């Protein structure tokens, strides 16, 4: 059941945990520079590096093509956050220093709202982002 659940949801099992230094993640690399955050890794595959911080997401908006396999790699430099994309089964907890990885293919174009569903401080209720899926 665990294998089916993790495969169906597109979640990478915990044995493949990736880590980053939360004190320097904003200084260099794909999480620090929104211009480097969306990387085409194959003919119809993209990796998106998302930084969840108090109280927002970077990059914002995130633009991806419809029908492509998207691998989100999400981390935080400060506190625990959530990364839930409304209208999808994407829902991961984001811990400082750890990279939460999830795969998803958007079958429909449009705008999808990202919300933080882990209380992260006084501005939590304003923590939103947007994914724009283009045809």
Curated annotation (Swiss-Prot):
From the record, what ranges are coiled-coil? none
Position of the signal peptide: none
Question: Any keyword Transmembrane?
Answer: yes
Membrane topology for this entry?
Answer: Peripheral membrane protein
Q: Kindly list the positions annotated as binding Cu cation.
A: 81, 116, 120, 124
Name the catalysed reactions: 4 Fe(II)-[cytochrome c] + O2 + 8 H(+)(in) = 4 Fe(III)-[cytochrome c] + 2 H2O + 4 H(+)(out)
- A GO cellular component annotation in the UniProt record: plasma membrane
- Name any one Pfam family assigned in the record: COX2
Q: What keywords are annotated for this sequence in UniProt?
A: Cell membrane, Copper, Electron transport, Membrane, Metal-binding, Respiratory chain, Translocase, Transmembrane, Transport
**An MF annotation (GO) of this entry:** cytochrome-c oxidase activity
Q: Does the keyword Iron apply?
A: no
Q: What does this protein do?
A: Subunits I and II form the functional core of the enzyme complex. Electrons originating in cytochrome c are transferred via heme a and Cu(A) to the binuclear center formed by heme a3 and Cu(B).
What family is reported? Belongs to the cytochrome c oxidase subunit 2 family.
Its protein name is Cytochrome c oxidase subunit 2
The organism is: Thermus thermophilus
